[in-house]
Amino acid sequence: MSSSGTSDLPVLPTDLKIQYTKIFINNEWHDSVSGKKFPVFNPATEEELCQVEEGDKADVDKAVKAARQAFQIGSPWRTMDASERGRLLYKLADLIERDRLLLATMESMNGGKLYSNAYLNDLAGCIKTLRYCAGWADKIQGRTIPIDGNFFTYTRHEPIGVCGQIIPWNFPLVMLIWKIGPALSCGNTVVVKPAEQTPLTALHVASLIKEAGFPPGVVNIVPGYGPTAGAAISSHMDIDKVAFTGSTEVGKLIKEAAGKSNLKRVTLELGGKSPCIVLADADLDNAVEFAHHGVFYHQGQCCIAASRIFVEESIYDEFVRRSVERAKKYILGNPLTPGATQGPQIDKEQYDKILDLIESGKKEGAKLECGGGPWGNKGYFVQPTVFSNVTDEMRIAKEEIFGPVQQIMKFKSLDDVIKRANNTFYGLSAGVFTNDIDKAVTISSALQAGTVWVNCYGVVTAQCPFGGFKMSGNGRELGEYGFHEYTEVKTVTVKISQKNS
């Protein structure tokens, strides 16, 4: 997930209008049952963009009813050929490609994401992911099993049913596609709750769902708050599975609610405090650049952020020097402004949390190399910050910061750094930089993380499974493994008169 250039960027639209602000159920737009709305803001200017209908339990109930009806045996969705499901997903990808400029602009304006990153990275990723999922629709298959006796046995990989999907604010459109793509490819129906900070692109995609020709009730989108709409999804007795991307704290609540209700299936992609280990024999320029983007991409608002950099003692000072030099190159500003290379944090809550953690680093004895405070008079901007001389017991070395703050630690031996890297509740991802293949394989095997990148960082594609160890979640998204999360395996055994080999 490295920053992109701007050479291929189309000119921003000057007349952007937000068309879709209502709840989407059964391919129709609805006001909230309560009549409530909530404001949506631009984090770069703190200005209100619009008011969106606020869904809660009553609206979730309506959406689940529609999704359940669409999933009934004999429904248009259940009787549709798998290849036709794939065709609908291809069509949706084409429509997103058609509206790519509009969606990227909206993502930047509502989420504080650099326009170049939104257009070149996020939208490109969404389109590729949908097409990948579309191709899988008619390739999800069971097996025949040669059991003992005069029987014919086979397995079916069936859709789970109604899936609740709760989307985070840091990658609103990407995570929406990660959720609905595999679910729909497998034949499920979905009830989606986008993050309250960033619901706009999901609601626009809802209009494209209808335009693509998905039957009513297959996709339903209910904007609202976590403690109301999100909790209603997690605890709903007629939702068969819930998938969530977000904080570990909220992930625990979702898993608890799933267990206390109907034991619905759960997939969680949660927080991280990912280690990045740089050995003395590494290509230093490459390591500095990947480690830098690993933590500063999207203002540090990434679950995979390389937020613990362990550098071998002999190259530590030079690594710090180059990292500080690189961090000082940022131009902060409105992410829609040409030339800006760092945008704002998503909201004041996150902004205050990041600044508090920066202050803790100063007080606990880390050396502030650059940054260390807010920027500007308006918007939630934080200076790119680098700390050296960080030790493992400091808050900035243990807690997920979710901001543009790099911690650089020193190590002497491989055994020591592996123990320190694994000494965390999290286990989402990790990086290793070395030119020694033996060390690369040894360290990669020892690290407790769902993804390990060697001599690179943040390479995430639709073909690869993604997910965490330990308290970074459970289950996998994307890749062939990701489709397993959206099917139930059924064994069917038929008595026959005679079995032949």
Curated annotation (Swiss-Prot):
Q: Which UniProt keywords apply?
A: Acetylation, Cell projection, Cytoplasm, Lipid metabolism, NAD, Oxidoreductase, Phosphoprotein
Residues marked Transition state stabilizer (site):
N170
The cellular component terms of Gene Ontology attached to this UniProt record, alphabetical and capped at eight, are: axon; cytosol; synapse
The cross-references to PROSITE patterns, in alphabetical order and at most eight, read: ALDEHYDE_DEHYDR_CYS, ALDEHYDE_DEHYDR_GLU
Choose any GO biological process term that the UniProt entry carries and state it: retinol metabolic process
Which reaction(s) does the protein catalyse, per the Swiss-Prot or TrEMBL entry? Answer: an aldehyde + NAD(+) + H2O = a carboxylate + NADH + 2 H(+); all-trans-retinal + NAD(+) + H2O = all-trans-retinoate + NADH + 2 H(+); 9-cis-retinal + NAD(+) + H2O = 9-cis-retinoate + NADH + 2 H(+); 11-cis-retinal + NAD(+) + H2O = 11-cis-retinoate + NADH + 2 H(+)
PANTHER family (UniProt xref): ALDEHYDE DEHYDROGENASE-RELATED
Q: What is this protein called?
A: Aldehyde dehydrogenase 1A1
Its source organism is Macaca fascicularis (Crab-eating macaque)
Question: Taxonomically, what lineage is the organism?
Answer: Eukaryota, Metazoa, Chordata, Craniata, Vertebrata
